[in-house]
Amino acid sequence: MREPLAGTQTLIEAKGVSFAYGRQPVLEDVDLEVRAGEFVALVGPNGSGKSTLLRVLLGSLDPSSGTVRLFGEPPSRFADRARIGYVPQRPVLDSEVPATVEEIVTTGRLARRGWWRPLHRDDHEQVGHALDSVGLGDLASQPLNELSGGQQQRAFIARAFAGEPDLLVLDEPIAGVDAESQRRFRDSITHLIEEHGAGVLLVSHELSAVASDLDRVVVLKRRVVFDGPPAELAASGVSLGVHPEDLPLWLEELR
């Protein structure tokens, strides 16, 4: 088992980040930081720039201005990508690849351990735990391309869990899943943070399952309009830019 990360270590950091598609600004002067052991939620209305910000933070897009650091390095220089587990909202799957769910999840473990190192008993156990954490243990031997879109996304979440990343970045990972799957998801997040000191950045509209575990909530509307503990958001009067009846249940519960 590897040593937990130091709680003061900054895993991902953005300073003064702006981004535009052509002349259309999407992000404006965004500051964001996630440290080891932190569980941070990124929320905001549709079109607020959340998914774009994730892509900028991870180096898929270059900011128009400002700086980004992954583990202290510019994304273009950060080579140890196995330290990061990233699950986009809509993972891209090659339908011609006949891999099973378990095989796909195992690649997450291999990426972290080293592709040419044999897997040991604890590695296979971690893959099994990851599958169970997203409710796919019974479907481990099924071809991934035969699963529904939601099940495929859960398989990629399990792949990220199997690698026990130092930084976990998730874009809408629990939309539409049942309460039991949400509980398992929460337990896996808690394990990563408590046992390994991992940092977690979560984009989601459905945070009721994890609201009590969050350290910070960041509200994005092209720029950061709030960054602080969930309870302070409920008292701050910051609007998420949606109709009151559409406010997430977790926010209502904090009032």
Residue ranges of model-derived segments:
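Conserved ABC ATPase signature
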Residues: 143-147, 151
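Conserved ABC ATPase "signature" region
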Residues: 121-139
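H-loop (His-switch) and adjacent beta-strand-loop-beta switch element
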Residues: 216-229
